[in-house]
Amino acid sequence: MLGGMLTAQGVCATDGNFNLPSGLWNEFRDHLRKRYGGIGALWTGWVSTTLFEPHVADSIFHTMAAAEPTLEVVHGYRLTGILRRGKRVTGAEFTDARGGRMLVRARITVDATDLGDALPLSGTSYRLGMDARADTGEELAPAEANDAVQDLTVVAILKDYGPGADRTIERPAGYDPAEFAGCYDLSSEGVHSADRMLEYGRMPGGKYMINWPKEGNDINLDVVELPHAERTAALEAARQKTLRFVYHIQHELGYRRLGIADDEFDTPDGLAYLPYHREGRRMDGVVRMTLDDVTDRYARPLYRTGISVGDYPVDHHRNCRTDLPKILFPPVPSFSVPLGALIPDRTENFIVSDKAISVSNLVNGSTRLQPVVMLTGQAAGTLAALAAERRCPPREVPVREVQEALLAQKAYIAPLYDVKPDDPDFATLQRIAATGILRMTGEPFHWANRSWFYPERTIPVGEFTRGLHDFAPRIPVRTDTTALTAARAAKLIAEAGGKAPRIRPADADRPLTRRKLALLLEECLDPFARPVDLHGEYR
């Protein structure tokens, strides 16, 4: 199957980005809406606004791939080696189930594996598990590092076979109803009632995604560093736990008409082809994104280098281990992922995507979700194409060139909640937001956090000078709270080194909206054209 988490892993209820219709994520969602009949047809369960059948998503991805004449899709191989010369990656080796080998030589290689399997093979340094507070600077990180990753899940897709049907599976070995006694409350009609538990992942087509964290089928297994055969054997425990949970749903709860879907996964047990890994290896990149880059966006200039966006809270699944530190995560606004998190610190001609990007363990809880991973992958592919065209290492491709290429694909580089791709000024407002001259206002909001640009609001003089000062330090930060007028904006833009805007006398004393100010900035100062490095510092 094509699609990873969304298809082969069966995680077909997407988390987040409903209000960030960016790039490939939006293209994929448009295909789903056309296939099923609109937005409402996908909003079938309460965990997500976008639910679908894995085989439908797979067909969509194959259709999208077939539209690219230079793209060849090859199935049935797994990564077994990385080709390299010193610190430079030159391609990869793959092996099929019969032992057949395939060598792919490439100018640029991208690791899009779930667990970062190309990292050790390429000699790229990485981290695994929870980071120490002294290492990341995150106040919420534990005092000491450990190698514990989040719980994983083997997803089951159940199908309603109709009244009178009994699709109860054979009682699995080792089944004990007490194992799942806390997954629901039979006396409750609330969130954790039996029906509500199933409605969590209700999909179109009379199906249910079984990916339940509350004493359900999550499991903690130490498999990341195991060789392929040993990892596969160890993951059998996850498959067995899901089968026990399915039997529990059928036998104890009485949902006998719900059986493992016969039209999704061609596996011996009918479960997803691959486990849903929430965390694996995390590369040491040119930069490392931390939770502080989300909670305090403007403390570091990494926001200037955004290449993908997300709006999901920090979500860790660690219920299966009681020996780990308990962390109460703060509410966060939406965020962008910096370009430098995709580029290894030392390895050349190599880009990292998926969950193996250079992020802290804490913020991985937000960057790991399907829409963010898809958009980060789009950025990785864009960076790879530009590096190949330029015949240069990825780290030498200008940040702004990557961002411009993404904007041309209607992809977000800043997580603007209130400016959509069909806005005629979308690209301009994205660019100006990415300079920080006009700052976003973050808002934690339930499970769909926001960052507002407020294009139709005016802006105080002091707020404008604060943003302009970062671009042109010669501009002093003022405390003036009056609304910025066109004449005052023109004067400040000229003082910052821009062209003097031509302002009609009748408009001189009128306050500018943030939209009009952004257009004026782009026309007369063009701050986005000023290069930034991978740390977001102006060159």
Question: Which residues does each predicted region cover?
Answer:
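Conserved N-terminal/central alpha/beta ligand/cofactor-binding core
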Residues: 2-81, 85-87, 127, 150-156
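Second-shell loop/turn segments in exported
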Residues: 13-18, 45-51, 105, 228-235, ...
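Stable alpha-helical elements in mature extracytoplasmic
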Residues: 24, 28, 57-61, 114-118, ...
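Glycine-rich, acidic and aromatic/proline-enriched surface loops and short helix-turn segments
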Residues: 34, 67, 81, 342-358, ...
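Flavin (FAD/FMN)-binding glycine-rich loop and adjacent Rossmann-like elements that form
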Residues: 76, 95-108, 112-406
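Long, well-structured alpha-helical subdomains associated
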Residues: 396-426
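Extracytoplasmic Gram-positive cell-surface binding/anchoring modules and repeats
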Residues: 415-528, 539
